[in-house]
């Protein structure tokens, strides 16, 4: 994205930053709806091998599309440069901000340290203690539960 093309820099950067996250959530929403519509059919008995593999393929395609798009949205909204979350904070902050300078310079190191913390804690303690993993797992679980609840109101079963 070339910010020089924006008439209003802050609004343009905010729109671009939120577009990716919102698109991920919309794709997850639509795929979860299709999966919920097909849920009972996917788990019904199939005498034909072709139908069985079609159901298998659709279940994994739609299920992973839901989960991956939720995870992508949650990862992209982290306030680390150059992710979308940083751009959102940048749009609402003053231009010469110490936090923004710090994050531009050290975000890569911070993200690497957070991910390595997960690998080290998993290797030594058998538990992934990475804040990024915990955040995505918990908040992603809440979003998935909300989708299950929503489709349950319509009498649909979201098999995730």
Language-model features: locations:
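Hydrophobic transmembrane alpha-helices and their immediate loop junctions
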Residues: 1-160
